[in-house]
Amino acid sequence: PPRNMDDMSLSELPVPYLENRPDVALIDVGRQLFVDDFLIEENWLEKRFHQAVLDETPVLAPETPMEWNKGVAPVAAPFTDGCWYDPADGVYRLYYHAGWFDGTALAVSADGRHFTRKMLDNQVGTNRIFVPKPGWQRDGSCVWLDQETEHPEERYKMFHYFRTPEGDVAQVAVSADGMHFGDPVTTGLCGDNTSFFYNPFRKKW
């Protein structure tokens, strides 16, 4: 990313690939998801957006003491955390916000629809994957399964944004199994819903 950005600016960020459009955009690098007209020269199709249908049974609902949070704003929601299918063990892993500004927890599934909470030893009796320091409240979070890493101990990468008594802090950590993460490292300045991803075509984060 550019290093000369104004950290305090509220204006929209520039979009380089829109400001400097190439004459020809190569799309033979892999599968493409067409969400706009950027890569389309001409077409004869009519866009039609349909109303989403809400399933009567949610994938997750508050059940555990951590999620119920003593009745204050119960939460069991994926938020920005992430859901991954891990081919190593054939399991879907759903990372989610458990309890208002509290935990990051793990639920697993064989089909991607029916999830059960994976009890872990990070905090006995819970499915918490990361125990924050006392007084720290989690905000945005993101977990990424890196299937191209050359370091098995870094297959899972996690970002957390915390509200702390001393000020906001963002941290990253890595894990081999997606359940036990190493000591986190503090990042530079960023926002509460900061995210990250890996582009397998360009081989860049």
Name what the model sees in each region.
Residues 1-205:
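Carbohydrate-active catalytic/glycan-binding domains of CAZyme proteins
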